[in-house]
């Protein structure tokens, strides 16, 4: 996203796929920055997970723990952009970029399959963001030789 005007350049980690950065517009015109997450997103990742409702945590991630330790968040951001990928949806807020959704994949062994998960903060449900995150994750996976994304969803998850 360093190609977006008025946005400061942020150092990218080795192997960072800048080609996956782009802006997406919701139906109401809100700009959402779609990009791979980076280690410097640590505080935003912690706030994102802690801001999810218990229902969203349970339906999307099958657990209800709302507290995330710094070490847990660091593990979530320890991605290599090949076998492990995390794509974030971020919006500009007065305090900086805020994560409002994340899609992830983890390659299964050394195969062309990966497990995936998507979670969107409650305020953004029903706006097409989950679909857009899945589309972005699919593009990233395909470019890295992953042909199948597998995910688990609870039956009561109707969103």
Residue spans of the language-model regions?
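Long, contiguous binding/interaction regions
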Residues: 1-159
């Amino acid at each position: 996203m360093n190609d977006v005007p008025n946005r400061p350049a942020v150092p990218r980690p080795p192997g960072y796929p800048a080609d996956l950065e782009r802006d997406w517009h919701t139906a109401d015109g809100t700009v959402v920055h779609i990009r791979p997450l980076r280690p410097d997103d640590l505080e935003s990742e912690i706030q994102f997970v802690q801001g999810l409702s218990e229902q969203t945590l349970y339906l999307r991630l099958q657990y209800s723990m709302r507290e995330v330790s710094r070490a847990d968040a660091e593990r979530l951001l320890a991605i290599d952009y090949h076998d492990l990928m995390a794509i974030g949806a971020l919006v500009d807020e007065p305090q900086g970029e805020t994560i409002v959704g994340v899609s992830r994949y983890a390659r299964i062994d050394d195969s062309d399959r990966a497990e995936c998960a998507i979670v969107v903060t409650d305020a953004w449900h029903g706006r097409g963001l989950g679909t857009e995150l899945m589309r972005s994750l699919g593009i990233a996976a395909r470019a890295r030789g992953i042909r199948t994304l597998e995910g688990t969803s609870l039956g009561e998850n109707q969103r």
